[in-house]
Structure formats: structure tokens, C-alpha cells
Amino acid sequence: MKLKLTLLSLCYILLSYSQDYKPNNTSVKSNNTNFTAITNAKIHISDDKIIENGTLLIQDGVVIKSGKEINIPKNCVVIDARGKFLYPSFIDVFSSFGVKKPNRLSSSNRSPQYEPLREGYYWNDHIRPEQNALNYFEFDKKKARELLSLGFGVVNTHLNDGIVRGSGSLIALSLKGTNSERIISKKSGQYLSFERSIQTNQAYPTSIMGSMALLRQLYHDALWYKKGNIKNTDLAIEAFNTNSNLTQIISAGSRENAIRADKIGDQFNIQYVI
């Protein structure tokens, strides 16, 4: 497996709104399934593909077609964008947008803490795969405006704490609407790092080599657990195994650590996004 580093992706913001099932007591509600066509625009499909005087066809917030010769359906809302440019938005694939980092756990105990504080979870509290970004998420309009002004339309946000940090969520930076309308994917990837969690004072690991050893041990334990060889329930390992089908995103922190992370991926046949 070759070392692969992540580049920021470009894509159109596809905001799909699900069927409205909540009562609306403030106004008369009507479902609009009409098409919207943005015409005569200069559409940047990619860095080397540009459509002059192009048309972008949208239905229910989703881009259906783009091109020069697009058949515009009847009853379509047409917006003339002559002289305007349409660009895909950036996606911040490694973000903590709207997810406040937890407070550092204080302790008056001067002796080292070797045991975990949590029961029913992994033996090391720096492993926290059960965390999900949505459980800590609060939309930040001010920060969203800043990101939108820089060309970002979507963020892949997560709780930036721990060696295994849990699952992130893909969020559209829409200033209007609610979080239920902004959520593109509730679980968009599993996040990892070599950094200790500030939510615990557990002594181990104390070094980068210790973090690597702990991560390797977790993979062995997770496989052993998956085979049914551990009778006790471990909520952290169960979450880790559940998240194993997600994209695995690891924060290495340096070029040397990126190589180290890739070697761990080689060992367990995992392609990290680094």
C-alpha cells in the first residue's frame, strides 16, 4: 500500500431536503418540486473544464445537469446569470467546526492514574470511538460566514480529542434552515491521531511510540472481540468495529508520523487518509 496524503476535494454542494413530516403552524405549506435553471453562466466544472454560457439545472436542491445545451423543463424557474461565474465549493475534510473541544480533566491526585475512569469501555480512556460529532455539535453562524467567504461550502467535522476520536459528520454551511437540513452524513468517517485525550488523566501512553503501540493493540483486540473471543461487553471496541467501514482519517502531525501511521495501516490492511 502506498502512502496517500489528502488533497482538499472540490464538489458542488448538493443539499437534499427530505420530506417534511413536522407540522407547520405558522404558514401555509406547499411542496415545490419545480426545476430551477441558472442560465448563461460561466460554469467551472473542474480546474481544466469550463462551460461558457452554460446552464445548471437544479431540482429539490440537487444539481441534476450542467452543460451548454440543456433542455429546460416546463414550469421551470429561470435565473439569468449572464456575466456571473459558478464555482464548486471547497470541502474541509478535517474540521472541528461547531464542535467545542472538551475541558481538560483536572485532578488533585499527584500519583499517576493507571486505571480507566469509565466502566464498560476499553481499558484505556484515550480510546474513544463511541464519540460522535453530532452529539457535541452546535452550528456557528459567524464561523460559517467566514468559511463561506473563503469558498468552503461543506465541512467534515469531528471532536478533536483522543487517539481514537470517534465518528465525524458531514455538514453543509447553510446559514438558513436547521441542523436536520444541514446534515449530509451523520457518520462520515472515523478519526484517529497519536495525541492523548484531555478528558482523562490516565498515564499511558506517554510518548508517540506508546500511542502507536496502543493503537496496534486496539486493532488486535478489536479483531479478537469480533471473533467472539471476549465475553465481556466493550462499548468502545463495538463502536470501533462499527466505524471500521467508514473512511479512516488520521491526524499524524508531522511527516515522520505520517510514515509511521502508514506503516500501521499496512500492518492491518487499512488505507488511512492522512
Question: Which stretches of residues belong to each language-model region?
Answer:
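Histidine-rich, glycine-flanked metal-binding segment
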Residues: 21-23, 28, 43, 47-89
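Polyanionic/metal-chelating signatures
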Residues: 140-143, 148-271
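Extracellular/luminal Protease-associated
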Residues: 131-135, 271-274
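Second-shell loop/turn segments in exported
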Residues: 27, 46, 130-134, 204
